[in-house]
Amino acid sequence: MAFDRTIAPPQSKLVIGEVLNFPGKWSSYPPHHHSQPEIYYYEFSPQWGYGHGELGEDVYKIKQGDILPITDNKVHSQTAAPGFHMYYLWSIRHPDEDPYDGFTYIKPFETMLDLSLIHI
């Protein structure tokens, strides 16, 4: 769920969303990037659970209450460890000179969205 410019007043300066991540599954996937700064806040069930956040070429172990700032147009995606539900709240700032209007998938992952290319 996202609260973005499609449902917010034009004066809005933030895009806000939340994600419920199933155990062992990816989210914010395929990897993507955008020029605006973003921040993630994480919670887990059970609380001692964890996941991983990819940020560029770095991978961070994410735990209950952690915050992951995303800057510099870095590619990012998230995964919950098996056995742990992960929740995160994310927010992207709308700079006046560069408002958020979506993200860009990186190659070759954008092809994953074209179902005609999947052969089973």
Show where each model-derived region lies.
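Active-site proximal loops enriched in glycine and acidic residues that flank catalytic Cys/His/Asp
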Residues: L55, T71-D72, W90-R93
